[in-house]
Regions:
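Long, well-ordered alpha-helical scaffolding segments within enzyme catalytic domains
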Residues: 138-150
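Strongly charged, low-complexity linkers/loops
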Residues: 115-121
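Short amphipathic alpha-helical "recognition" segments used for binding
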Residues: 10, 133-135
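N-terminal strand-loop-strand beta-hairpin
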Residues: 1-113, 148-176
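Secondary-structure transition motif
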Residues: 121-123, 133
Length: 176
């Protein structure tokens, strides 16, 4: 199990942020087109979910549990699986039905051990996601990119969608 420590900045200009990342020495890791199925593992557990995700090359199965809304409020357990479609079929044959299908893109960078992503989500637009080992690194990196501390949110994607009037937990398909 790992605790995710991540912060987000919404409504960014992806080209400006990419230029700033390169200017501070961030290393490009790749551009990904993600497809995912999200499952509810238990009735009455809205803050727990299972995610099957692929970028076409790497496929992972991840269980996530949100304990609070802080930067470090999500725990995750993740394994790599070899076949996206077969894993989906196995999960559904056990009776676990997916609640939604989702797509997003990610332009990912590494900077002094931090994973920094420019994500694009349908109807949500572009956002910056920074995953670090220590919470204070979120503030350090965003400052170097020209953002203010009040620009940073710890909200998860479901909350960000809720802020624009979309209940992502009731949305069967979320794609471009």
């Amino acid at each position: 199990m790992a605790v995710e420590i991540e912060g987000r900045i919404t409504n960014i200009n992806p080209e400006e942020v990419k230029a700033k990342l390169l200017a501070i020495g961030a290393k490009p890791l790749g551009f990904y087109n993600f497809r995912r199925y999200v499952f509810d593992p238990a009735i009455g557990a809205p803050h727990r979910w299972l995610r099957l995700r692929t970028d076409g090359n790497k496929t992972t199965l991840t269980f996530k549990e949100l304990s609070n809304d802080s930067f470090s409020g999500t725990e995750e357990w993740e394994i790599e699986v070899s076949d996206f479609e077969t894993t989906l079929e196995i999960l559904e044959k056990t009776g676990i039905k997916h609640r939604s299908y989702q797509e997003n893109t990610r332009d990912e960078y590494e900077y002094h051990g931090a994973k920094i992503s420019i994500d694009h989500w349908p109807k949500l637009g572009y956002l910056l996601e920074i995953e670090v080992e220590k919470e204070e690194d979120i503030y350090d990196i965003t400052s170097k990119l020209g953002f203010n501390p009040q620009d940073i949110v710890s909200a998860n994607h479901a909350d960000l969608y809720q802020n624009i009037g979309i209940d992502v937990n009731s949305c069967d398909v979320l794609k471009f």
